[in-house]
Amino acid sequence: MSTLAFAFAATENGFELRSGAAVLLRHSADAPAFELGIGVADVDMCRGNFRIEDDLAERWALDCCEVSGGTVRLWSSQRRELSATVQIHTRGAKAQLEISSESDAANRIWIHFPREASESIWGGGEQMSYLRLNGRRFPFWTSEPGVGRDKTTDLTRIMDESGNAGGDYWTTNYPQPTWLSSAHYAVHSNCAHWSALDLSVQGVSTYACWTNNLTLEFFASYGLPELVGMLSDRFGKPAPLPDWAIGGAIVGLKEGAASFVRLEKYADAGAAISGLWCEDWVGIRQTSFGRRLFWDWTWNAARYPDLPAQIAALTERGIRFLGYINPYIANDAAMFAEGAAAGFFALKLDNDDVALVDFGEFDCGVVDFTNPAACDWFADRVIGREMLDFGLSGWMADFGEYLPTDIRLYDGSDPMEAHNRWPVLWAKVNADAIAKRGKTGEAVFFMRAGFSGVQAHCPLLWAGDQCVDFTRHDGIGTVLTAALSSGLVGNLVSHHDVGGYTSLHGNVRTAELLHRWIDLGAFTPVMRSHEGNRPDDNLQIDSSPELLAHFARMSQIHARLAPYVRHVLDEGQANSLPAQRPLFLHYDAPEYHAVQDQYLYGADLLVAPVIEANVTGRHVAIPGEGWADLWSGKPLNMGQAWFDAPHGKPPVAYRLDSSFVTLFAELRKEFG
């Protein structure tokens, strides 16, 4: 077996970086790997949706080089003053490349990597549309993902006309400049500025970054599980989820005090309930978008008069109470004056006034997490006192993508660079708040926004705001792609809003959608429902006896799977593998490289949810031998298998050699 150790060597007119037989980087005068340029960014933000353009003045290939040991000096034969120094360090199955421009004017870097025709590329953070990235370009900039995310649809066009809010296949709350290859190597860029990976040209992968210096890290392994593990170890692991979070459904209701009355309908129907999530615990602000929240992070006694006593009563029944928070404070909130007086908000560029951001018919200040005192205040005074001390066991830690690029930060950093780092700072504030109260591993927060390094702080991703439909780029199926792609770059656990969220322009839930999403939710680590942005316009789980009975059944299945899920999560902590895995992670064959509509749930379950409307079943790829249908026990052969899929029985298979085969047999007997 060839060695995986990286090797750097000079060639006749350039150099190469290799791992085994694979060439990861090749530079020559005829085919330069590096370019420098000079550009000016043009950025416009409307409610978290960004229009970003580059006024590029110059772009030159660095076609000349001198190699001395692990140091390379590069320059352009056309403009010699455009030059850079590259340092390459190799250490076994890892390597590091540092490039620094020697020209003060240069602020754009392009790096070209060779790519074999047979290679598949994955990663990029949490991608919603495509698991296999080949053939497309993916910018890395945290933002709202948009509504519709498909330029061919009427909904996307309507949303684009209203604040550039339609999105596209690449827009995501959680981008990350990290990619993996089926050739068993990975590349990570430490650049937090705007960057992009372009895979649209056959045979080459081009990474562009708006900076004059950056570091690339290379990883190599004999197999994909080991490669994913290396990335997980690189970015760090958060605290494991507590048992309560994986043992039944977290019911999302936001009807004030009536939420507790409605919860009893779920309990009476037999639902296994682990939590009640009331994001409106802070009060309501009605907008044209729908029912939104009042962003003052404290209990709203008018909406929930008896909340302390009700939380205590739930706790006695083994049910946790969860709430909502985000890193902004409305300028008409009492807490805003407190933060402003202490200097805890980001400021305008031209004066010391708080920079206000439009969030859609209300304005907010941005808590400045580059200020350590502001971080401590938010972690202790806000999350600690108002939430954890009050009795909350968890919360949605929303947003993090809206940092404007035209504000002034406490530490003097460039907002263009701080923008992508903001979700990581936000995650750390939440994790620190929990740690300060001694509740690490007991309290849980979940986030949609992310960037490189969020893995170490956030215990639970949430796939953001899907439309309440089956559409290809913004519907139920995107949560599968989100979980699989984010898992490849070191995020161990993902989940989603059961039922979807965004309902606009007549797009409302159907009973079929709710049934299918409930089925999917039961086979994810955390099963949490959401009423959506317009609850009164949409079907809810308790809108009909049939929906409620179905939810109760599937929540019971979710609770019964808890021992297996705990095993999977423990395995993730030990071996750095995500709970939901692409088929190719354990069955490394080209035919599985683009499969994103089914997943391995741990190593022993294969889940293939129905994510299309008006179908009664689906074909499922069975990878390898030794599988059986969970509901019938019928053995399955490798290849394509047809599954009937009535509501309540999504296509699921289990390994016949699993140590949990008894649990799966009990599930079949009880629910089959």
Provide a role label for each language-model segment.
Residues 240-411:
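Aromatic-lined carbohydrate-binding/catalytic grooves of carbohydrate-active enzymes
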Residues 432-443, 449-463, 482, 486-496, ...:
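Catalytic core of carbohydrate-active enzymes
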Residues 187, 194-197, 253-258, 282-287, ...:
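Flexible loop/turn segments at secondary-structure boundaries
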Residues 346-392, 427-468, 529-550:
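Alpha-amylase-like alpha-glycosidases and glucanotransferases acting on alpha-linked glucans and related
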Residues 2-245, 250-258, 263-268, 451, ...:
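Catalytic and substrate-binding clefts that recognize carbohydrates or anionic sugar/phosphate headgroups
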Residues 27, 34, 280-281, 289-359, ...:
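Active-site-proximal helices and loops of the catalytic beta/alpha 8
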Residues 99, 178, 266, 314, ...:
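Conserved, mostly hydrophobic/aromatic
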Residues 251, 274-281, 300, 322-326, ...:
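Generic beta-strand/beta-sheet core signal
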